[in-house]
Design a protein with these regions (language model features):
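Short alpha-helix
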Residues: 171-188
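A short glycine-rich, Lys/Arg-flanked "PGG" loop and its adjoining helix->strand segment in the class I
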Residues: 122-134
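A short SAM/SAH-binding and catalytic strip from SAM-dependent methyltransferases
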Residues: 108-120
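Class I SAM-dependent methyltransferase SAM/SAH-binding core
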Residues: 53-97
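Conserved class I S-adenosyl-L-methionine
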Residues: 1-41, 43-52, 59, 137-167, 171
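A short acidic, Gly/Pro-enriched loop at the edge of an enzyme's catalytic core
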Residues: 99-109
Length: 230
């Protein structure tokens, strides 16, 4: 099946973003916020990579953090902007590196239901290690790759509860715990918490889709993602 970009490029899909999260009982945003809450403080800055409509970062805003966000879709950024909580938003494709932020830009980084769009996460993890301050938290989700599962599969971009159609299908990727742990270690992060949860049911296989949430702390390690760029 031919697949498309994971970036939302039409106003209808963007307008349905929040509705689909409710329809599919998606609580990944709440999971990540709950796991990260003890490590953040009011007044801290948080950068949401793939902020979308702001479902995840608005929770951090309500806890007193200053939110910055990046997304490749103008349509969902417009929706996020209309909610009026973000201190700064940028349109940028996460595949285009380096990211448009200086080194040690923010206290914390989050990325929820985004990293499963990437087959190779290594370059992005290097960038995240560069822009986060030492002691900061990187909280994110990936889809857990279980034994016997293929790494990649097709799914609808927004209507995930329906079988994939060629005009709306995108490729998503699963990642094992060992792979994520290795990337975190290589980039100077200490793993603090993990939690597996059911994200939604994938209709093409009639199986539950399991995501795993991670919370890791950036350590002050020489040569671990601290190269000055941008």
């Amino acid at each position: 099946m031919k697949t498309n970009s994971t970036i939302i490029q039409d106003s209808h899909s963007a307008s349905e973003y929040d509705n689909q999260a409710r329809k599919t009982n998606w609580f990944g945003s709440e999971v990540v916020f709950g796991l990260a809450y003890e490590f953040v403080r009011s007044g801290n800055t948080v950068l949401d990579l793939g902020i979308g409509s702001g479902l995840s970062s608005i929770l951090f805003h309500k806890a007193g953090l200053q939110v910055f966000g990046l997304d490749g879709s103008s349509e969902v950024l417009d929706i996020c902007k209309s909610k009026g909580f973000a201190a700064g938003l940028k349109k940028h494709d996460l595949r285009d590196l380096p990211l448009p932020y200086p080194s040690r830009f923010c206290d914390h980084v989050i990325s929820v239901a985004v990293l499963n769009s990437f087959k190779d996460l290594a370059p992005l993890f290097v960038e995240i290690a560069r822009i986060i301050k030492a002691g900061g938290i990187f909280a994110f989700t990936v889809e857990e790759q279980k034994p016997g599962q293929e790494e990649g599969y097709a799914i609808n971009r927004v209507e995930v509860s329906e079988k994939p159609k060629e005009e709306t299908a995108v490729m998503l990727y699963r990642h094992s715990e060992a792979y994520i742990a290795r990337l975190l270690s290589q980039n100077g992060f200490e793993l603090l918490k993990t939690l597996e949860f059911v994200a939604f049911k994938y209709p093409a296989e009639n199986k539950d889709v399991f995501f795993k949430a991670y919370v890791a702390r950036k350590q002050e390690l020489e040569g671990a993602g601290d190269n000055e760029r941008y």
